[in-house]
């Protein structure tokens, strides 16, 4: 993503409901739950759907696919799977928490959402390490930095994400609360289970990958600026690291890191705070809703960041558009010939 993508963070409402007791009543749905939040996330996801399809289409249609392209394509696919599952959760929110799609679909949607969260974190981390070796240590691990092996690495990350999400496949189900509402929720048996699972999810998908990602990009920036200063001090007429490239790389990294932190951190902080609260306050609800919107907004922002911050995507889009147009014209000509 970007190298940072958070479109893939698990913001499903069921994880905030502390559903360790099946008799725990689902709170009366407010206008925010049933109208405002579903509408906002619906708009955000619609935009993200278009943007991520554009990214995947651009990469697939490109003749020369690079190693970063494979990582970005996988992140965009994860965003798409995540966004496609959102209408079901939006429908549940709009109906005041009622789930009408049955138990199997509840398990599938919730589990894929969590699997995508693990996958996004893993892909972002590995891609950051790959960028470090490509720019700072270009002659190391070259045998692993091929398109074929990068595809295998990404498949391995998806498989590992599926395994890490096994608790969700087991415990996500339709729960009937005492007010009669049947909701798709994560059914844990005790507050301790909720505590340990929240810590497990937060650490593995945010607090563990974040330092690795930051270290990789800090080292990349330090190396790039060091090379630029060396060339500048040597007064090279044609420096290998021009100032424009350094500034562009710095700006891109700062933007992507900022988007990652701003979109993911609030939700995970809210989840940790929720563990200590017996009765959520109005401020907590406001923060929770904002964290959800920020998490899903990243799914819409990331594709456009790829396009705006990457010169390769800006060059590829017109080329692919011309190729598609030429192909359509050729097909139309063949069709006309067949009629005469």
UniProtKB/Swiss-Prot annotation:
Membrane association type: Multi-pass membrane protein
Keywords attached to this entry: Cell membrane, G-protein coupled receptor, Glycoprotein, Membrane, Receptor, Transducer, Transmembrane, Transmembrane helix
Keyword Membrane attached: yes
Family: Belongs to the G-protein coupled receptor 1 family.
Stretches of the chain found on the membrane's Extracellular side: 1-34, 93-106, 173-198, 273-286
Cytoplasmic face residues: 58-69, 130-149, 222-252, 310-340
SUPFAM superfamilies: Family A G protein-coupled receptor-like
Alphabetical GO biological process terms: neuropeptide signaling pathway
Membrane-spanning ranges: 35-57, 70-92, 107-129, 150-172, 199-221, 253-272, 287-309
Glycosylated residue positions: 10, 17
Coiled-coil residues: none
Function comment: Receptor for melanin-concentrating hormone, coupled to G proteins that activate phosphoinositide hydrolysis.
Cellular component aspect of the GO annotation: neuron projection; plasma membrane
UniProt protein name: Melanin-concentrating hormone receptor 2
KW Lyase (keyword) present: no
Signal peptide: none
InterPro entries named in the record: GPCR_Rhodpsn, GPCR_Rhodpsn_7TM, MCH_rcpt, MCHR2
GO MF assignments: G protein-coupled receptor activity; neuropeptide binding
Domain of life: Eukaryota
Subcellular compartments: Cell membrane
């Amino acid at each position: 993503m970007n190298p940072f993508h958070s479109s893939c963070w698990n913001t499903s409402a069921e994880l905030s409901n502390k559903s360790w007791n099946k008799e725990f009543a689902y709170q009366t749905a407010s206008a925010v739950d049933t109208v405002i939040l579903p509408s906002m996330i619906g708009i955000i996801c619609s935009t993200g759907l278009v943007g991520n399809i554009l990214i995947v289409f651009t990469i697939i249609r490109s003749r020369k696919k690079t190693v970063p392209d494979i990582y970005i394509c996988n992140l965009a696919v994860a965003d798409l799977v995540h966004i496609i599952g959102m209408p079901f959760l939006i429908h549940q929110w709009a109906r005041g928490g009622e789930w009408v799609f049955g138990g199997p679909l509840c398990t599938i949607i919730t589990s894929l959402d969590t699997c995508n969260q693990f996958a996004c974190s893993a892909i972002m981390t590995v891609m950051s390490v790959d960028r470090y070796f490509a720019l700072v240590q270009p002659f190391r691990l070259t045998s692993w930095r091929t398109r074929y092996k990068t595809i295998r690495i990404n498949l391995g990350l998806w498989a590992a994400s599926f395994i890490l999400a096994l608790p969700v496949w087991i415990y996500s189900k339709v729960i009937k609360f005492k007010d009669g509402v049947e909701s798709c929720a994560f059914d844990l048996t005790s507050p301790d289970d909720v505590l340990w699972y929240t810590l497990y999810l937060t650490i593995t998908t945010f607090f563990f990958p974040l330092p690795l990602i930051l270290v990789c990009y800090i080292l990349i920036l330090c190396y790039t600026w060091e090379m630029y200063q060396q060339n500048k001090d040597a007064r090279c007429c044609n420096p290998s690291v021009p100032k424009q490239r350094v500034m562009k790389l710095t700006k891109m990294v700062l933007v992507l890191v900022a988007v990652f932190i701003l979109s993911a951190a609030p939700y995970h902080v809210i989840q940790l705070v929720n563990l200590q609260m017996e009765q959520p306050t109005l401020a907590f609800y406001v923060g929770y809703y904002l964290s959800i919107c920020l998490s899903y907004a990243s799914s819409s922002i990331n594709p456009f960041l790829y396009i705006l911050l990457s010169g390769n995507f800006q060059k590829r889009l017109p080329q692919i558009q011309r190729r598609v147009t030429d192909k359509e014209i050729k097909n139309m000509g063949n069709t006309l010939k067949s009629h005469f």
